[in-house]
Amino acid sequence: VIRSATREDPNLLNIKHLIVTLVAILLNPFALFAQAPNVRDTAFSTDCDAYIHKVMKRVPEIPSVAIVVIKDDQPIFLRAYGLADREASVKADTNTLYYIASSTKSFMAMAAALLDKEGKIRLDDPITKYAAGLTLKASIPDKVTVRDLLIHTSGLRNGPLTFRMAYSGEADEEDMMRVFADVTTYDDARYGKYAYDNLGYNIYGLLLQRTLNKKWQDLLQERIFSPLGMRQTTAYVSKARARRMVIAEPYMFSADSGTVIRSPITKQDNNMQSAGGMMTSISDLGRWLRLNMNEGRLDGKQVIPAEIMKSLHTGYTQTTRDEPPFTGNGEYGLGWQIGKYANEKVIYHHGGFPGWSSHISYMPGKKIGVAVMINEDTVGGNVGHMLATYVYDWLLGTADREATYAARLENGATNYGKMKEARQASVRERATRTSQLTRPLQDYVGRYRNDQLGNIQITVQQNSLGLKLGNIETVSTPFTQPDTVRVEILPGQGEVIKFGFNPDGQIDSLSYAGMRFVRVK
């Protein structure tokens, strides 16, 4: 029988396939076991999945959870639960983007370490070297280095800069350079002492733009996101929406309505900032964890030099405070905190913003890493930490963990209920107040300006005074003193605005956060 030249004998093909498979196994005996999860990983996945379902049932205010667990350089658990967008009934999946807030610092510090190695912006240079040409009102000594900015020991302060960059979004480069130069103060007594805030990373972003004419967003894309294959990660909200990427919309508890609502503060390009300005997926965070846990190697390649990875994970200053769930006086490296859990070293960085919570951590000694992202922040931060420690305790074999975590869930839900009731009681108390404004509402309408904090626009909304400060919009409620109103510039944080009058009795200013805003229109 003459066989076709284009077809092989099926029996011969089977024999060839068997030989190839046997050779592959001999060359890599672990390959056989990599084809399917082992019994322990399966048990872990079953228990973890069940616990997350219990959490979301007991705390239904949580819209969605995305979680990845890395063990021995492999993702053994990668899932998303719930809704990215409740109003549109859009489900979350492992490619859904979440805003990770301050967890961005780890990425920014890595980019800074790469530039340091290349001699472009040296970490141990004085920051004044890169601020040359700016007239700094504060006398900043040369001992304040770029590294100090990134490990929170600079002794610098500038509340208006960090507020505008993270919240209001009135943060164009020229104006922020001016606010940096004019408003920054230096306190020598604070120099060298850890004081966590966004300022150092914000200043680094400005110096980067000034020195290399490079936006921090583009630096992250070129040096980190692209080389790591993080295709579902961006520092531009506009690009995510243009690509029709699913974004987990932000939610939070509203004491006014007694329900979970969309966060009134949104993230746009203008308030995505170098201390907290990334959106990423849980799949991409799995790659990020693997890179950090494997000394810069990913998928068999050395993507980031090992010496740079070591520099990021080395502690440079004592934090002198607990950072739940990791206790003990820890250290701060370059964009990473270093602490302990169950007497094991943990390297981590959390993030939080109205409507989003993130937890990223790993235990190098046990080769375990976990990331959790939640699009809610009233209780989301605590839930994320609880899920992370559940993972660690399960994989460490902690005794009685199921009973322990059932109790933690119940206690947490009970405390959350008490917090909600306390906030609603405060709303009921404030509802008894009456307006103390002495003029018709229209008389207060106008634009008020402060050179440090920007512009406040006062309008009439719902028979009350409305306020717009950059991206932020809110409606005031009565306060207890003449010509004052209560506002929540940041959700859940009540503050007072007081209007001022000129000698002719005309409204010419308002005061907010201890600063005077002059009426300009």
Where are these regions (language model features)?
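Active-site-proximal flexible loops/turns
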Residues: D73, A112, T162, Y236, ...
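A generic hydrophobic-helix recognition signal that picks specific residues
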Residues: L26, Y98, R190-Y191, L206, ...
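Bacterial Sec-dependent N-terminal signal peptides
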Residues: V1-P37
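Catalytic loop of the DD-peptidase/beta-lactamase superfamily, centered on the K-T-G motif
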Residues: Q35-R79, Q209-E222, S226, S263-K521
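Helix-centric, low-specificity signal for extended rod-like, repetitive segments
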Residues: D9, T21, Y98, A413-Y416
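Active-site-proximal loop and beta-strand segments within enzyme catalytic domains
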Residues: S45, K57-V59, L83-N198, G205, ...
